[in-house]
Curated annotation (Swiss-Prot):
Species, as recorded: Salmonella typhimurium (strain LT2 / SGSC1412 / ATCC 700720)
Protein name stated in the entry: Outer membrane protein assembly factor BamB
Pfam families associated with the record: PQQ_2
Database matches in PANTHER family: CELL SURFACE PROTEIN, OUTER MEMBRANE PROTEIN ASSEMBLY FACTOR BAMB
Family: Belongs to the BamB family.
Source taxon at top rank: Bacteria
Chain's role: Part of the outer membrane protein assembly complex, which is involved in assembly and insertion of beta-barrel proteins into the outer membrane.
Mode of membrane association: Lipid-anchor
N-palmitoyl cysteine lipid sites: 20
GO cellular component, one term: cell outer membrane
UniProt-listed HAMAP family: OM_assembly_BamB
Keywords recorded for this protein, A-Z: Cell outer membrane, Lipoprotein, Membrane, Palmitate, Signal
Amino acid sequence: MQLRKLLLPGLLSVTLLSGCSLFSGEEDVVKMSPLPQVENQFTPTTVWSTSVGNGIGEFYSNLHPVMVDNVVYAADRAGVVKALNADDGKEIWSVNLGEKDGWFSRSSALLSGGVTVAGGHVYIGSEKAEVYALNTSDGTTAWQTKVAGEALSRPVVSDGIVLIHTSNGQLQALNQADGAIKWTVNLDMPSLSLRGESAPATAFGAAIVGGDNGRVSAVLMQQGQMIWQQRISQATGPTEIDRLSDVDTTPVVVNGVVYALAYNGNLTALDLRSGQIMWKRELGSVNDFIVDGDRIYLVDQNDRVLALTTDGGVTLWTQSDLLHRLLTSPVLYNGDLVVGDSEGYLHWINVDDGRFVAQQKVDSSGFLTEPTVADGKLLIQAKDGTVYAITR
C-alpha cells in the first residue's frame, strides 16, 4: 500500500511512507516501477519555462498554474505569486505574500491551496489559515481573510461566494467582494486523516464536497444548509492506514450524477438531488479524476491508470507500468491522457487502449501537482517552482 501524505495529530509536516510498516509492524517495502520504455509517436515541445520562487520542495501542496486571458498565474510555497505572459513566459508582475521578517528577509507565507482565478482576482490559501484575493491587474491585495484552519485545497468561486475547505473539516463561504465569512459548516474529522482536503464542486446552487469522515456532502451555497450526506468509505481494516476513509478528491457532477472517489473506499456515483448511491466500484485514490463523455479516467492509490465507464464503473483498460511512481492527477490534452511523476517525467497515454504514445523528461525535481490545459498548451509546475508550457 502506498501513502503519500499523512496528517498525524500534532504533526504539521508531510510524511512520506513507502509502506505500512509504521502501523502494522511488518516490513512492507514498495518499490517504484522502472521507467517504461516508450517509442514516442510524437515529440512534445517545451515552448517556454520560467521559475516561480523556490517551489514547494517535498511539502504537500495543491499549487498549480492557471491560465486566464492569455496570462498564467502561479505561486510558490514561500509566498511568491507571479503573472506570466502565456506566449513566452515573461513576467507581467510579481508579489510576495510572506510577511517582512527584518530588513532583508520575509517569513514564509506557507501557500498551499490554489491557484484560482475568477472575476478579476487571484485566490489562494495558506497553511497559516489565510485566504488572499489579489487583483489580476497588478497583484495587489484586494482582501485577506483568516479562515477556520489550513486552506490546503484550492478556493472555489461560484455565485459570488468563495468556498474554502479547511484542514480541520470546516467548509466556509466567503463573500467574493470583501472576503467576509458568510457561513461555516462542520464536516467532522476523524482522529487520523490524510493531509489534504477535497475542493468542492458546484452545481445548481449547491456545493458538493468530500470529507475526511468518508462522506460526501451537499450544502446550499447561499445559506450554508446541509442538503444531504452520504458515506462512500467505511473505516475498516487491521491497521490505522487501512482505516483511513478520506474523500480528498474533488467530486465531479455530470448530468445530475455526482462521481466521488475515496482513498480507501469506493468510486461512487450518487444522485445529485438525493445523494442516494447509484453504483459503486472498489477503487481508491487521492488524485482528482476526469469524467469525459461516457468515460472516467483516474489514477488509483497504487498509481495504476484506469479508464472506466460512467455506467457502472466497468474497467475498459488498465495501465500498470507506472506503479508507485507517485503520479499526478491526469489531464486530457489533444486526445491523450497525460500524467506527471515524481522523477519529472510526463507520460502520454492513448485514451482508447491505455498504451503509451510518448514520454518526456521535463524536470529533475519532479512533479507533485497536476498539469492544466488552456489555449492549446499544457502547463505544469515542478517541485522546484519551474513552470513549463508544453505543446505536442
